[in-house]
Amino acid sequence: MQSAIKSVEYDRPLAAGAACGVGEAWAKVPDALVPDERDALKARIKALLVREKAVLVAHYYVDADLQALADETGGCVADSLEMARFGRDHDAHTLVVAGVRFMGETAKILSPGKRVLMPDLDATCSLDLGCPIDEFSQFCDAHPERTVVVYANTSAAVKARADWMVTSSIGLEIVADLHARGEKIIWAPDRHLGGYIQKKTGADMLMWQGSCLVHDEFKGIELDLLRHEYPDAKILVHPESPEGVVALADVVGSTTQLIDAAVKLDAQRFIVATDLGILHKMRLAAPGKTFIEAPTAGNSATCKSCAHCPWMAMNALSNLADVLERGHNEIFVEAAIAQRARMPIDRMLDFAARHKQRVQASGDLQRDQALFANVGAA
């Protein structure tokens, strides 16, 4: 594997008008609500969704109240791939995206005629922050012979510079296909996900050195100790996690794939190495099973995130209601950038649709998704 001689930081100084950094994000997380306030806000939001001909599209990592509200109102709670498809195909006039900014941008790119709102436009992503378009363009220009594959967790401008966009649920399959065709790849921005895919496919990948603030904090040593404490538990790991964590996994997969594994595996106890927001959906999908948060640090240490994204935490019932009431926090993407960015997104969606048809025809969806057999071995 080749790797870029480059170091990037997710909490770098931000340009004027850029989304907020880690500390400011935590400061902007809305206060918790008492039950009466929560119920009143949910009722208000339901009425506003109808009034505005809007649908709520939420990620698995946002607050459980938002996920429940999306389910109750005919919206969507999903990973970034399904969020993109759902928003594109839904007939709502307005898409309200509860997640981080790149998700809102992707929704706008795929649905240019729809209004796209977000509870807080400052909600960003460490991977997005760590891959600024000017530096990334220079990096790509230095290697013009390579196919540029970017993760969904990037800005619209970075996507516009790419040949392919991928999510964690389809990235391995797309890179394997490109490798089979003899293509050399630039991968950005997550080095852990890229390294996992490279080891699985053998592809020639030149890596951008970004990482997720949440997943980068999981500790292999501490996870191994927890595994011995709960020897009957299966370990579920998102591939944005460090190699030492992935090596201990029983299942490595996207958020949707990890939820599927929690439902379908016979185990009654799971250790989960991804953002703790996913536990809401896991508990609903697999009632009676026990889910334990994977450790982000030792008992005497501190962590940056404690397994929760500060920018995801900025999404709340209070600012969702405010956005619907006032019609602000609308996402806009420059037309030329949106047009270029749509190509790699559509390529991914088309590939995913064809891949799903092939797998369904073979009758072997579980094995093809690598959910259950030796997936932790890299």
UniProtKB/Swiss-Prot annotation:
Pathway: Cofactor biosynthesis; NAD(+) biosynthesis; quinolinate from iminoaspartate: step 1/1
Binding residues annotated for [4Fe-4S] cluster, in chain numbering: 125, 212, 309
Alphabetically ordered keywords of this record: 4Fe-4S, Cytoplasm, Iron, Iron-sulfur, Metal-binding, Pyridine nucleotide biosynthesis, Transferase
Organism in which the protein naturally occurs: Burkholderia pseudomallei (strain 668)
Disulfide bridge map: none
Protein name: Quinolinate synthase
Enzyme nomenclature, EC number: 2.5.1.72
Function text: Catalyzes the condensation of iminoaspartate with dihydroxyacetone phosphate to form quinolinate.
Record's cofactor remark: Binds 1 [4Fe-4S] cluster per subunit.
Keyword Signal belongs to the record: no
Gene that produces this protein: nadA
Catalytic activity: iminosuccinate + dihydroxyacetone phosphate = quinolinate + phosphate + 2 H2O + H(+)
Cofactors: [4Fe-4S] cluster
